[in-house]
Amino acid sequence: MRVKLIAVLTLAVSAVCQTLPPGVQKKASVGGITEYEYPNGLRVLLYPDPANPKVTINMIVQVGSRHEGYGETGMAHLLEHMDFIETNDGRQIKNEIVAHGAVWNGTTSEDRTNYYETLTATDENLKWALDLEAARLVNVKINKQLLDVEMTVVRNEFERGENSPQRVLSERVASTAFLWHNYGKSTIGSREDLEKVPAERLGRSTGNTISRTIP
């Protein structure tokens, strides 16, 4: 299944090139935000802001926890964490982001996963950030050693949620409202599923939607 992507770019530019690459279509323009679509289904929302000295790249993958199968709860969120570590050709993703002085993060919800960077607006930084997002989507390294390290981070996040009355309440309400739908399950998943997920399964799929190649 093809993964739907949305790239949201906020640029500090005085003008935007009006000549589109072959196959790219301009879909709509509202309130200064213009939508473009590439032949592969990638959608780009471009928002030029001449007063802003920063550039923001927000990559949205329209796959989230509701796409997880039985025994896969928490895999979308765990994969988001893995997407900040390393590529198969040795790029250290988080280290690169920090070295460029970017404000960055990633989040997982029921319907989507997103990754973003905000950094000084230069052509070099924009090219680097787009290249990084491409590498993150198709070339992330997933193996048992990296998974074991990141599981410590995810496990701590899980335990913090267990001690949050607000999160416990929201999870109880959701599970009652959506008895037979993944909207009723926690995005971070269950401890049982998280503790037993093998690297091969995480790398192969999240709800049979995102494919990876395991080295």
What are these regions, as identified by a protein language model?
Residues 2-8:
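Sec-dependent signal peptide recognition
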Residues 5, 17-95, 116-121, 127-133, ...:
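His/Glu-rich zincin catalytic helix
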Residues 7, 80-83, 153, 160:
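Hydrophobic side chains within alpha-helical segments
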Residues 10, 55, 83-86, 139, ...:
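A ubiquitous, low-specificity "background" feature that marks scattered single residues
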Residues 12-14:
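N-terminal signal peptide c-region/cleavage motif recognized by signal peptidases
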Residues 37, 42, 92-215:
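Charge-rich, well-structured scaffold segments of protease-associated domains
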